[in-house]
């Protein structure tokens, strides 16, 4: 009986430690069998932006980001002004920072990279945060797969 209780308590401690260490993202799943890279590699569609806690109106704007397994990235911004639709495409690379807490995007030919703190990362949803160093403004972006 004492051995059973001991092993039950030990199993609970090990499981709690294991499950609590599986996610580094505040809003993410606590356990997944998919690697962070396999969750990040996807076709992402920006569904919402909040800036300093206020939701921004995204009507007439569409941002699509494709992150490939080889580290390449393509961002496609579509927007409509006075009934005319425009599209801008930027190519570059993506990577995680050393502890995989941030997504780092670098446009081809750019000298500066954009860093986004990852708040949530599942196979279907990603939430990132970026702080503008010059203004201190905080933007939270929510992405879903298409």
Predicted ranges, named:
Residues 1-9:
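Bacterial N-terminal signal peptides that target proteins for export
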Residues 4-5, 16, 29:
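Short non-domain terminal segments
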Residues 17-21:
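C-terminal motif of bacterial Sec signal peptides marking the signal peptidase cleavage site
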Residues 23-93, 97-146:
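Lipid interaction determinants
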């Amino acid at each position: 009986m004492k051995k059973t209780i001991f092993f039950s308590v030990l199993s609970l401690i090990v499981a709690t430690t294991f499950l609590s260490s599986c996610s580094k993202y505040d809003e993410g799943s606590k356990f997944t069998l998919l690697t962070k890279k396999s969750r990040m590699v996807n076709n992402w569609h920006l569904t919402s932006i909040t800036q300093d806690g206020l939701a921004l109106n995204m009507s007439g704007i569409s941002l699509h980001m494709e992150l490939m397994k080889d580290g390449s990235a393509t961002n496609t911004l579509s927007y409509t002004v006075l009934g005319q639709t425009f599209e801008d495409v930027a190519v570059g690379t993506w990577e995680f920072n050393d502890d995989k807490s941030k997504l780092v995007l670098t446009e081809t030919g750019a000298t500066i990279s954009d860093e986004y703190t990852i708040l949530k990362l599942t196979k279907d949803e990603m939430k990132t945060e970026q702080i503008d160093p010059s203004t201190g403004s905080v933007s939270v972006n929510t992405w879903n797969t298409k």
